Regions:
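Non-heme Fe(II)/2-oxoglutarate
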Residues: 2-82
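Catalytic core of non-heme Fe(II) oxygenases with the double-stranded beta-helix
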Residues: 73, 77-188
């Protein structure tokens, strides 16, 4: 695992080789078992364009997910901290249809650290913004299959993502370090 810190528009990090090549193949095989959005099916725009499998802290973990959780704890110990007594880990296996986007936002206050693992071969990384309105310095995290980008959640960490330039489903694993016994429930915005 190779970590590169970046400081604009705010402090964040990019990781290469979070997953080994064998683990990336295993992840892609796992994703092949999950539903894929088609841009049509679903009763909301979000459900038509984004499918998410939530793995909450108290849920049992399959062997691949357990491996990802342990690797994330290792990453946390390098870029921040991790304590089983104070922190929980939540995962989201995300699949996003081409041409879709999510609004600029800051993460929920119970999130301490977010890391997005890039699974698909092609894609575009998380977009980082200096301001909530998208003005000022912007940066896109480099897409790195088996790697990804992350940040310590705090005031001013505005970000978004989209699949506007993609022609394939964007597959990622969002891993979040949370305050103990808190879960994040997303809205349909």
């Amino acid at each position: 695992m190779i970590i590169h810190w970046q400081y604009k528009p705010w402090k964040h990090f990019e990781v290469r080789d979070f997953l080994t090549s064998e683990e990336l193949t295993e992840a892609r095989t796992y994703f092949d078992t999950l539903s894929m959005p088609d841009g049509v099916t679903g009763d909301t725009e979000r459900k038509r364009n984004r499918h998410t499998l939530h793995i909450l802290p108290e849920m049992p973990k399959d062997s691949f997910t357990a491996k990802v959780v342990e690797r994330f704890k290792e990453l946390c110990s390098i870029v921040s901290t991790y304590s089983d007594e104070e922190d929980d880990i939540q995962l989201e296996y995300d699949r996003m249809y081409p041409g879709w986007s999510w609004h600029i936002h800051q993460d929920d206050s119970v999130k301490k650290l977010s890391f997005i693992v890039h699974i698909s071969e092609k894609g575009h990384g998380t977009k980082l913004y200096h301001r909530e309105d998208g003005m000022g310095f912007k940066r896109e995290v480099t897409w790195s299959p088996g790697g990804g980008g992350g940040f310590i959640c705090k005031e001013g960490t505005y970000h978004s993502w989209d699949t506007k330039k993609d022609d394939t489903i964007r597959k990622t694993i969002l891993i979040t370090k949370l305050q103990k016994r808190k879960i994040v429930v997303e809205n349909e915005r």
